[in-house]
């Protein structure tokens, strides 16, 4: 039964970085609307805690996966697991991010810059692209395609120190 504006019953939502922060908040919203949720994040313990919270909030089904979105193949494999476990995908919330460990670009090693971009930029791109491919296949088969949501940083609009 819908609890608010949306009814997510029977809908599968993938939330990257969904075991805490904004990602968990988004997943909780879907859970309260009765949706099924897949979480990709790197910390298995935090994934398990998030799963318990989401089920308590009313999610239909929750599966968590240890997926590092900085690698394209991990994302492709992760979608294969979601397809195997749920059989469909209705929404992708690309939320994984990495916090800069340095206050100044002058102090940031190039290696850290590449690690940061592998998650924040490349990971979001791979996640959205591969999710869109699955949704396109469904749309071509006559079903509704789905929704893609990219979560960005306020630093897009105002530089951070």
Provide a role label for each language-model segment.
Residues 16, 89-97, 120, 150:
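Rossmann-fold scaffold of SDR-type NAD(P)-dependent oxidoreductases
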Residues 19-21:
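Conserved glycine-rich cofactor-binding loop
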Residues 33-49:
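Conserved glycine-rich Rossmann-like NAD(P)H-binding loop of the short-chain dehydrogenase/reductase
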Residues 44, 66-78, 110:
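The beta1-alpha1 cofactor-binding region of Rossmann-like NAD(H)/NADP(H)-dependent oxidoreductases
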Residues 76, 99-114, 137-143:
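Conserved mid-core segment of classical short-chain dehydrogenase/reductases
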Residues 106-126, 149:
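Catalytic Tyr-X3-Lys loop
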Residues 119-141:
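Amphipathic alpha-helical dimer-interface segment in Rossmann-like NAD(P)H-dependent oxidoreductases
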Residues 140-161:
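Catalytic loop of short-chain dehydrogenase/reductase
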């Amino acid at each position: 039964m819908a609890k608010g504006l949306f009814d997510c019953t029977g809908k599968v939502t993938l939330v990257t970085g969904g075991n805490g922060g904004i990602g968990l908040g988004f997943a909780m919203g879907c859970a309260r609307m009765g949706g099924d949720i897949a979480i990709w994040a790197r910390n298995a313990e935090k994934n398990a805690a998030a799963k318990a919270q989401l089920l308590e909030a009313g999610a239909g089904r929750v599966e968590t996966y240890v997926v590092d979105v900085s690698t394209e193949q991990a994302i492709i494999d992760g979608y294969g697991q979601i397809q195997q476990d749920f059989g469909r995908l209705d929404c992708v919330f690309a939320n994984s991010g990495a916090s800069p460990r340095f206050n100044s670009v002058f102090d940031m090693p190039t290696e850290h810059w590449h690690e940061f971009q592998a998650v924040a930029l490349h990971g979001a791109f791979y996640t959205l692209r591969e999710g869109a491919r699955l949704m396109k296949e469904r749309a071509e088969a006559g079903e509704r395609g789905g929704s893609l949501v990219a979560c960005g940083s306020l630093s897009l609009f105002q530089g951070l120190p």
